[in-house]
């Protein structure tokens, strides 16, 4: 069983960007081309994040040090109502595909704006994961969002928004390169819906929720042609210098369907913001019991009927949850601003901007069956308080973490920012 740990950490992140961030994509860089006659705009930009961290605890073997945690090159093209964006990362010395999509705004009126989007980008079901890392007011996102919310996927969405309402929903594939070992891809349906009873130049009050259904199909051949699916759930310790997930991680074999709900709130004034989410995920499992039962017949200790085999190899749903609340106070600089197109708080990028931030987050990846015991020597659970070979325990222990973060952020200008956290 994973132990509770204490992790005092001092972290500093420096951000350099050739971009003045507009909305949640980088679309107003220094290097750009504008052709007003043909309503054409093109741009190229980039950014780099460098982190330094010192971890002090006797219980947690993590590596203090420094790292280039993110480096990106991006390009965008706007032609009339069509917007195309590509973003590629080189953080930690590795190439990675970030955002790559096309977006078309097909109707604008006083009642609202309608648009469609297709490509590879964040699924719209989480306030935290939808916020660009440059616009985030902390060095890292909370662990619960990393573990239970989706990141980027290949798909298509339809969005509508105005001053008081926001709706963003779509369908996505399980894997962007169809790289499952066997079987065909699964899919997910994701959406985020918001109501803003107050939304003016000074104050925004927002309530909403994200919903996601996921179907997992592709997997590996287990035995006798049976596909075994798996869901890996993991998060780092809210730091990028050492991104180990060994303290918060679990595998859910035979995962088939998953449902996630993420209610959220946001309050923003000129000098203060508060926001938070609660995330609840349930994972249902499925396997071909009949085939697996038949494959063990004839053994020296084989089960004689499928009901007995099921009782010795129990399968039940797994529930995981967590949440976070974040607060910020702007000591110097212009007012906090809000982005209607994404339903998100914008980042601090004014010259001389200084803010104080705080966050509490909890992540629970543990779902233990009542009565189960954990034997440290074997590193496994046993049901009903008895150390026996059968039945197997269906308990999951991916770890539980509570975290408190205090931060101070300073913006030299819209291109350079330094962030410190404890």
Stretch-by-stretch model annotation:
Residues 24-28, 34, 189-190, 216-252:
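Surface-exposed, low-hydrophobicity segments enriched in Gly/Pro/acidic/Ser residues
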Residues 59-60, 228, 232-422:
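Outer-membrane beta-barrel pore domains
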